[in-house]
């Protein structure tokens, strides 16, 4: 039986980490693509040379021609410019929109049956544009955001309570930006809701709000520390979790930027919501009940994403279709 084929479009820090993780998990053969010739080939060769030590079997190749991604089962898109200190994700819009147009054309031509995971920022607007540029089915194009944001929330909670990260569940909804909505009411420690833990004296409401704000600022905190780039280990791990759910038909319940067609009162936009990911791509969108405050925060986040999509249309009017 032929191995799955995974195309990594963009071979920067996230792309290289994706290739390593996909190899370690033996998810399939891996193609690293980048317009900067030599970088994908070099990283592919370097990671391949680690396979005898780490004990995985996968073919890794690098390319600067989209023809190399032909027939890919999964495409993970990281191409574009990363954030630098003082920049918001939204500052990247104009540059990365042009990149998405090129990437969309490449995927449409060579990998039209792939499950596509977009990581490029500003995430919600870029995945929306990528789906339109590529013409792929909406359930086969998703954005990686919620898994990462929820992972950050889970880590901070585990550190606060001094418990294992494995015992924390957390949900973050909305756009991947300053308006994201970490949902304390739907987050638990070993099944115990955070709201109950406040009543039990484990944490104050004020401290919990500080953790929620740190989650919102999670990416910016790392950008500020690195000074020359943005996060790559956790984003790569998050995207690999999504790819694995698709390739192995795991039916994982994962928050991601999915296309909404009326759910949560949102139409023709990509926003972070809980989904079921299996062999059919996004097989289901889970609509959870939101209280008044949560709904207001979610709607504010949706409004921010809508503004970015409108800005995209201003740059590329063809997206209005």
Curated annotation (Swiss-Prot):
Nucleus keyword on record: no
UniProt: substrate binding residues: 83, 89, 121, 152
Catalytic activity entry: (S)-malate + NAD(+) = oxaloacetate + NADH + H(+)
Origin: domain of life: Bacteria
UniProt entry tagged with the keyword Oxidoreductase: yes
Gene3D superfamilies referenced in this protein's UniProt entry, alphabetically: Lactate dehydrogenase/glycoside hydrolase, family 4, C-terminal (3.90.110.10), NAD(P)-binding Rossmann-like Domain (3.40.50.720)
Keywords in alphabetical order: NAD, Oxidoreductase, Tricarboxylic acid cycle
CDD domains: LDH-like_MDH
Entry binding sites for NAD(+): 10-15, 34, 96, 119-121
Active-site residues (renumbered): 176 (proton acceptor)
E.C. number: 1.1.1.37
Family listed: Belongs to the LDH/MDH superfamily. MDH type 3 family.
Entries under NCBIfam families matching the protein: MalateDH_bact (TIGR01763), PRK06223.1 (NF004863)
Protein function: Catalyzes the reversible oxidation of malate to oxaloacetate.
Protein name: Malate dehydrogenase
């Amino acid at each position: 039986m032929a191995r799955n084929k995974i195309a990594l479009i963009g071979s920067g820090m996230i792309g290289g980490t994706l290739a390593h993780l996909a190899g370690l998990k033996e998810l399939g053969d891996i193609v690293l693509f980048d317009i900067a010739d030599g970088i994908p080939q070099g990283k592919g060769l370097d990671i391949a040379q680690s396979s005898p030590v780490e004990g995985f079997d996968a073919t890794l190749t690098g390319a600067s021609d989209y023809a190399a991604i032909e027939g890919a089962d999964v495409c993970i898109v990281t191409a574009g410019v990363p954030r630098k200190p003082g920049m918001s994700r939204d500052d990247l819009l104009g540059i990365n929109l042009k990149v998405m147009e090129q990437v969309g054309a490449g995927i449409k031509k060579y990998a039209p049956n792939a499950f596509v995971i977009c990581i490029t920022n500003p995430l919600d607007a870029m995945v929306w544009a990528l789906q339109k540029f590529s013409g792929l089915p909406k359930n086969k194009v998703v954005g990686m955001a919620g898994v990462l944001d929820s992972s950050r929330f889970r880590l901070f909670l585990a550190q606060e309570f001094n418990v294992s990260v494995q015992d924390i569940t957390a949900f973050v909804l909305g756009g991947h930006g300053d308006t994201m909505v970490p949902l304390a009411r739907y987050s638990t420690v070993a099944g115990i809701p955070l709201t109950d833990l406040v009543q039990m004296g484990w944490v104050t409401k004020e401290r919990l709000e500080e953790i929620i704000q740190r989650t919102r600022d999670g990416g910016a905190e790392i950008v500020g520390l690195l000074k020359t780039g943005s996060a790559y280990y956790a984003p790569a791990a998050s995207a690999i979790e999504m790819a694995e759910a698709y390739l192995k038909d795991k039916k994982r319940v994962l928050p991601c930027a999915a296309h909404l067609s009326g759910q949560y009162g949102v139409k023709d936009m990509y926003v972070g919501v809980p989904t079921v990911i299996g062999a059919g791509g996004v097989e289901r969108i889970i609509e959870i009940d939101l209280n008044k405050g949560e709904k207001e925060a979610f709607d504010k986040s949706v409004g921010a994403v809508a503004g970015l999509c409108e800005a995209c249309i201003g740059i590329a009017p063809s997206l209005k279709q």
